Amino acid sequence: MKTGKELKPGTVIRIDNDPWLVQKAEFTKSGRNSAIMKTKLKNLLTGYKTETVYGADDKLDDVILDRKEATLSFISGDTYTFMDTTDYTMYELNAEDIEAVLPFIEEGMTDVCEAVFFEDRLVSVDLPTTIVRQVDYTEGSARGDTSGKVMKPAKLKNGTELSVADFIEIGDMIEIDTREGGSYKGRAKV
């Protein structure tokens, strides 16, 4: 059991026998009223999203999800097929089931992912915290403005756009932090 004040992003709770992922949690306490936790939730089975408010002392059922290592096997339209690395079982997910990690998934990637199961059903996939990708396009370096951290836009092979350091060129391998939408960490050491 968890209380409302213990909710944080990444926590999974059970509501009406469905697993709900806490995507955002904001604790608020005012002088007159009791403390509350404002949350954004996503149903892991249906993909439905909602905003809910819980009291700090509300009791909630937490859910323990099963996790297995998997790799991306292939992409067919909006269907992504992952393979269990231990028993080679294939699992399929639709694009909307993995929308949070979709910008970092590309055909031929070798990253080992974490397949997340609820009652033997694959509900999502988590990528490693840091992944390495190749820059497919970026503009040339800007001359003169080198007093601070100079960033410029870049595009990855799968079309994802992000800001990278000014010295990054086309073809460079970069490290990306996949948490919170993804951000440039630095040049990859290859």
Curated annotation (Swiss-Prot):
Q: Name one GO biological process term.
A: peptide biosynthetic process
- Molecular function terms in GO for this entry? translation elongation factor activity
- Involved pathway(s): Protein biosynthesis; polypeptide chain elongation
Q: Which GO terms describe its cellular component?
A: cytoplasm
User: Is Cytoplasm included in the keywords of this UniProt record?
Assistant: yes
UniProt keyword terms in alphabetical order: Cytoplasm, Elongation factor, Protein biosynthesis
Task: Say yes or no: keyword Transferase present.
Answer: no
Q: Which CDD domains match?
A: S1_EF-P_repeat_1 (cd04470)
Which top-rank group of organisms is this from? Bacteria
**Cleaved signal peptide residues:** none
Its main subcellular localisation, reduced to a broad class, is cytoplasm
Compartments, record wording: Cytoplasm
For this protein, the record's SUPFAM superfamilies field holds: Nucleic acid-binding proteins, Translation proteins SH3-like domain
Please explain the role this protein plays, according to its UniProt record. Involved in peptide bond synthesis. Stimulates efficient translation and peptide-bond synthesis on native or reconstituted 70S ribosomes in vitro. Probably functions indirectly by altering the affinity of the ribosome for aminoacyl-tRNA, thus increasing their reactivity as acceptors for peptidyl transferase.
Matching NCBIfam families, A to Z?
PRK00529.1
Q: Which PANTHER family match?
A: ELONGATION FACTOR P, ELONGATION FACTOR P (EF-P) FAMILY PROTEIN
Family of this protein: Belongs to the elongation factor P family.
Put simply, this protein is called Elongation factor P
Origin organism is Pseudomonas fluorescens (strain ATCC BAA-477 / NRRL B-23932 / Pf-5)
- Gene designation: efp
